């Protein structure tokens, strides 16, 4: 995501930097950058492991946010264009 994107400015200006939403945004940004890196370097297994760790951390934060504040969770996944969690 570019540094001047509207999603970035709305999350950084509205919310505290340490809020769950901004953490999820930054993890999503790192995931997109690592995904692009892995498209170029398919055998970079340490980066693949790092990507899986970041995905797990983002998933845990999304679960936390969905339990604590469902409307903010739905708004965030809409802004970031990511899939929601699977409901069991």
Curated annotation (Swiss-Prot):
Keywords: Chloroplast, Plastid, Ribonucleoprotein, Ribosomal protein. GO terms for molecular function: structural constituent of ribosome. Gene3D superfamilies: S15/NS1, RNA-binding. SMART domains: Ribosomal_S15 (SM01387). One of its GO terms (biological process) is translation. Its main location: plastid. It holds the Pfam family Ribosomal_S15. InterPro entries: Ribosomal_uS15, Ribosomal_uS15_bac-type, uS15_NS1_RNA-bd_sf. It comes from the Eukaryota. This is Small ribosomal subunit protein uS15c. It comes from Cycas taitungensis.
